[in-house]
Amino acid sequence: MKKITIILAALAMLLSCNIAKNTAAEECDCVVPGFMLSDDNIEVKVGEDGCLLVLRNKETGHNYASGNGLWRLFYNTHEEKEMQIDNRENTPAISHEGNIITIEYKDLVHRGKALKMDLTLTVALEDGSVRFGSTVINNEPGTIVRELQYPLVGNMNLPKGHKLLTTHTGGQLHDDAIDLIVNVNPKTLYMKPDQYFRQYDLQYPRHAASNCYAFVGESDGLYFGSHDESLQQTWHGLRAYPSAANKFDRLEAGFYRYPNAMCGDTWTCDASIVKPYMGSWTETSRIYREWRNTWWDKQEVPQWVNEMTGWQRIIFKHQYGEYLRKYTDLPGRINDCGKSVGCNTVLAFGWWSDGMDNGYPNYYIDETQGGEDAWKQAISDYRADGNRLVLYYNGRLVDRESDWYKHGNGKKATNKDNTGAEFAEHYKFTGEGTTLGYYDTRTFSIANMANREWRDMLIDWADRAMAYGADAVFYDQLGVAEEFPNWDISGEFPVQDLYTGRYKAEALREIRDHIKAINPEFCLGTEWLSDCTAQFCDFVHIVEFTAEPYSFPEWFKYTFPEVIWSDRCLRDDTDVERRANNTLLKGLVNDIEIFRCRGLIDETPHYQGYLAQINAIRHKYPELLLGAGRFIHTDGFKCSSKDIIARGYANGNRLAIVATTLCADGASGKLTVPGYRFVESSSIGDVKVTANGSKLTIGQNGITVLIYEN
């Protein structure tokens, strides 16, 4: 009895310690003086020192903040770069009026010296969200304010089980944010002060397809959104700081922006939104889409694009002169391959005389194959059999051996670095030796997307594609901001252009408006998924992977169901079922790129046979499983098994549920679809569906589509 009493006492002490630990922050923020904003949903409090004491979801009671600083600022002189200023040396004047807290720093101090730099921060409550604004005024001679990291939620208190949701490649879901950040590529750490922090690099509009991210739980979460119509390149700030040596366990989240304010300049931004919310991750989609609707400019796509299952991406002539396909193959073997898998579209690469990734922007027709007449005839013959032809151009690369670069205005229309020298890119395609890929590579400059002559050429190429008889024009690499933007070196300090994503969006809008005025059925596509550029395109060719364990393309599909985009990297007979199933499950069209566009799908018979089955199901229910079907994730239905992955598509009174499993032993579960009656199902592999559609049993990589009506 005495032993039991001791155990119970110990348990009670342990419980009281845990309660004390969980409530310590709440007690602290109540005691520490500061400035409070509150509505029915959220509570935010800033301390007298300008630190963030409270960021609370009032419904759950959870406080994400820990009393850390809200900002960091970086400036350069001519002698030293990237000097950091933060709240530790600076004391603010804080005021509170209505729903706004204003934090003012006059004459910022760095290393004990007062600078003629002012920073004003605002924290405003707006309908359950917090809007963070900032103004930088620089009057310090010989300086430039390069970067402002704000707002920052440091040493974040994340509820147990909350995952990091980014919009990388349309969506990625990471179980452990700290683990993702800490375990970055060690090669990048060599160049960074990794003893201070670890950082996960993510920018919009580059790998981040939308300008937001979130920490998501089953029924609540914390949303970070940059609601910035300027489309300035923005970093999604994700860092881990150490609580002890080499123990990086303090999560920090925020946004990083780039004022580039020289002496005499003022810069402002009020686009940062942070919102504790209730609901599943889909609430983050609703928050972002509600803002995006204020300037979304997506037009309906032609029916043939809605019915497109994907495309064969094929290189006709390669970079180094090898002919992989001839014009006459288009209505011949290429057509036969497409028909064998239910794909009636070709994305034609390397159709010009110089070959793929060579000669840009010449695009001279290949006279050795019969010239323009032969190419037009091949396209006409291919289209006559019910097919569609998409013509490729590169939207940004300039070959330094091209006529336009050597004899035209090419050198004036390319991006320059911070010394005025041209950036160089190399696309190292190889033959079967080593010389070509490692030594004898093509060198490209990068077109300045603000250049009018370049933009006019893009439009001219669309006209040329229409003249050839193509159905669409495709511009490679126009969906994303530049990694190496143009620098202006005319001022006291060189300044990078952070609006290249906006320029590309403007260029795509010009092309879209031009071609649609001529022929509404003629279409436009690009590579890289970004919401700011996808809105002007009829389809998008993705970059990177969509079927990794952390891949979550559901986020972008749910947020922008009208955008048609592809998978990538399924190019041989390996792991076919899982990856092909993923495209049907997630609503992605197929990018058929056999052997990196060097082969045709009849050279990969396993992939060929399986994709034919996938597309047969798509063609059976095109109004649901192709472009017209609206991706609804799991809205309106439930599956009892966590081992079954089920996703829904709706159109009118009909609903399709696509279900599969990755479990080696298979899985069984019940489907509940209130308000709908089961009609039928179509399956591939080891699948059993009961007569009323309420229960299903699926073997590993089996897949089924269940149809319901109300």
Model-derived features with residue positions:
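Active-site-proximal substrate-binding groove within the catalytic cores of carbohydrate-active enzymes
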Residues: 259-260, 264-270, 503-687, 695-709
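Acidic/aromatic-lined carbohydrate-recognition and catalytic surfaces
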Residues: 348-429, 506-526
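Polysaccharide-binding surfaces and accessory modules of carbohydrate-active proteins
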Residues: 26-43, 63-105, 109, 125-238
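Bacterial N-terminal signal peptides
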Residues: 8-16
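Active-site-adjacent "subsite" loops/lids of carbohydrate-active enzymes
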Residues: 323-327, 374, 391-468, 553, ...
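Beta-strand-rich recognition/accessory modules
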Residues: 36-38, 126, 194-307
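The substrate-binding groove and active-site-proximal loops of carbohydrate-active enzymes
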Residues: 310-328, 357-372, 438-457, 490-504, ...
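An acidic-aromatic substrate-binding cleft motif
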Residues: 275-357
